[in-house]
Amino acid sequence: MSRLYPVLQGIISAWHNQDVEGVLVHVTDDIVWRNSSGFAPAIRGKAAMRAALQGMAPVIKTNKWRIFDYAESQDRLFMEGVDEFWLKTGEHVAIPYAGVLEFRNLLVYQWREYFDGRISSSMKAGAPMTDEVQNMISRPIAK
């Protein structure tokens, strides 16, 4: 029985509703969120994460973030999924990624995401989804 994955499911459910506080209830005050694959500095602390999420929410019309596979090891959750969303300007963006969440008392305190930023940039600029990305994200959702 999974112990950590239900926490991630709670985060995803909150973000589907763009419920920033619903996301933050699952992280520690000292969260370190590396959400740019090393392109930008880590977001450090719950207040900074709140500001980042509040900055994202107004530009996203809807999102379909989902996880295809995961594995747990002690207090780590490894995940593979897609961050798929539609911007209010009309662009459709789908970013396949892998990530790791580290937990302390069932709260996320380290969050690392790994993805190809070129996919994100090109789709945000209006490029269509490639067949390869479509194949990568057309998988069943993990239960």
Give, region by region, the residue ranges found by the protein language model:
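A beta-strand edge to alpha-helix "cap/lid" segment located at domain peripheries
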Residues: 3, 51-143
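Short acidic-aromatic low-complexity motifs
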Residues: 2-26
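Alpha-helix initiation/capping motif
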Residues: 1, 38-42, 90
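Proteins with a high burden of low-complexity, intrinsically disordered sequence enriched in S/T/G/P/A and R
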Residues: 15, 35-39, 121-124
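A solvent-exposed, acidic/Ser-Thr-rich amphipathic alpha-helical stretch
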Residues: 21-75
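Alpha-helix C-capping/helix-to-loop hinge sites
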Residues: 11-14, 34, 85
